[in-house]
Amino acid sequence: MVQVNSNYLKLKAGYLFPEISRRVNAFCELNPTASLIRLGIGDVTEPLPQACCKAMKTAIEEMGSTSGFRGYGPEQGYLWLREAIAKNDFQSRGCQISADEIFVSDGSKCDSSNILDILGTGNKIAVTDPVYPVYVDSNVMAGQTGIAASSGHYEGLVYIPLNAENGFEAELPSEPVDLIYLCFPNNPTGAVASKVQLTKWVEYAKKNHALILFDAAYESFIQDPLLPHSIFEIDGATDCAIEFRSFSKNAGFTGTRCAFTVIPKSLKGKTLDGAEVDFWSLWNRRQSTKFNGVSYIVQRGAEAVYSLEGQSQTNKLVSFYMKNAEIIRKQLTLAGYKIYGGKHAPYVWLEAPTEMDSWQFFDHLLNKANIVGTPGSGFGVAGEGYFRLSAFNSRSNVEEAMRRITSI
């Protein structure tokens, strides 16, 4: 009989969001007339920017003609999109990133998992706690961890707590690590990192010959012009970091699928015998072998994000969701909840009532207010006692959700 990847059996029962769906479905079966408001999973609700729609319509018409038809595109993405990304997202902020260091993909979730394909085994890995579950689960699947201990932590991982006591600032590990996952603005806490904080991480990574995997999926929600949007705004980061970005949240591409990963050509790792190898070549080989690229139509839609019309429309989308976050923060603060995040990210992180754990508060909101949120414990041990609410919904739903929560 064929053998399975037994590392999957080490995963804790139920990925966070499927477990939420299971509980919600069970509730709906018992309460078919209930009007649920979903502020849980970070999926957008507003329509795509019209600039993107127009560009994709034009691309569809091109594909329907003999002269405009395109088959397989470059696995790394079309050059015109990569050039637009490099110019607008990096070079405009002083980052020395070129178009050929950008790899277009169908999602940063995929990239942050698939990057393990080019990393060796035995690396010491650091993650924040709480953390986006994909970082941990993908390492478990790849055999990079031991089993989950009774504490809830996986053996072999170094956990960096993010909590109210440390101001949700990721502190440097007390021991050398090889691989570091950072996400700022942070999912789930909504915390943001300053240039000073990121500089400490870059200096640590260079000193310890470590690699930073930097998830900047929510950078467009940063409101303070002094805060960095990219790890590459920090001197030396091109020698120690890979960055993941996405069009999912700023342009509403969660169902359209387009993202990109930035791998500087100067970034190097080593083989078991100590020889240096650049990560760019490894990732390029990986993508050429396992990925056929994002569709031409979708890439034209992504390119339109950088047009004047596209920039105006995506800025309005971001402002809309951040206004929702402001409403959530204000109303829950008035109701006596302790609130964090929501200022530079579309997520509000709050403390559950003292008599409830995270899942009890989830069930409380579901049953008493018909509101779906995300229990903090689903993001890690340090998330216990916290709860995440997403600003991704209509204005009327957010206002109604706040009315319901504050009245129970």
Curated annotation (Swiss-Prot):
Disulfide feature: none
Protein name from the UniProt record: LL-diaminopimelate aminotransferase
InterPro entries membership: Aminotransferase_I/II_large, DapL/ALD1, PyrdxlP-dep_Trfase, PyrdxlP-dep_Trfase_major, PyrdxlP-dep_Trfase_small
Cofactors named for this entry: pyridoxal 5'-phosphate
Gene: dapL
Binding site for pyridoxal 5'-phosphate: 72, 108-109, 132, 187, 218, 246-248, 257, 292
Pfam families: Aminotran_1_2 (PF00155)
A molecular function GO annotation: L,L-diaminopimelate aminotransferase activity
Signal peptide bounds: none
Keywords: Aminotransferase, Pyridoxal phosphate, Transferase
Pathway: Amino-acid biosynthesis; L-lysine biosynthesis via DAP pathway; LL-2,6-diaminopimelate from (S)-tetrahydrodipicolinate (aminotransferase route): step 1/1
Binding site for substrate: 15, 42, 109, 132, 187, 292, 388
Domain of life (superkingdom): Bacteria
Native source species: Prochlorococcus marinus (strain SARG / CCMP1375 / SS120)
Cited CDD domains: AAT_like
Assembly mode: Homodimer.
